Amino acid sequence: MTRLAAAAVAFLTLFAVDAAAQKLTGLKPAAVLPAPVALDTTGMFLAKFARVGDDVFIGGQPTERALRELQAQGVTTVVNLRTPEEMTRSVSFDEAALVRSLGMTYVYIPMRGNAEYPYSPAAVTKFAEAMRSTNGKLLLHCTVAWRASHLWGAYLIKERGIPIDSALANARAINLSDERPPIEQLLDQSLPTFGRPPHSP
């Protein structure tokens, strides 16, 4: 089996739900927060890709093939955090058009941590709305899952009431690093107000 074929098989196993899987989208998400499950997705995503529970996927930039596979496996909402400049410069296809042509909902929340595309509480609110309103599985992505991990961590703290240590550990298992400044901006509040991460200064 070629490496690409093996990666495709591994990709599909992400959707094999076991008894411990938890539904995290919708109006009544599971109370227990599952740990992210990561797999090698060579040829499908630019970088990291993980499943959290039964129905949330967080990763880097998906390929056209990845989006088609996701749609076939029940993903109905795609949330993109990349800026227009990033998409124009480095993505060879129109992601929004492809997502919509496949019958999925496209939610655009460009974030870069600058004046034009800041990390803001509004981004957390918009993502939370997407989590509540989707009628299927959801993909959250940026370039390498770094911004996506930070938004996920902020969402867990603000919208799900997950303790800061647990929220950051969950996001860190995807691709979170140097978490304090962007998450504080997303929450518009310093982390010590919510609790301080372990071993932090």
Regions found by a protein language model. Name each.
Residues 6-15:
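Bacterial N-terminal signal peptides
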Residues 14-138, 153-201:
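Cys-dependent protein tyrosine phosphatase-like superfamily
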Residues 1-4:
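Positively charged n-region of N-terminal signal peptides that target proteins for export
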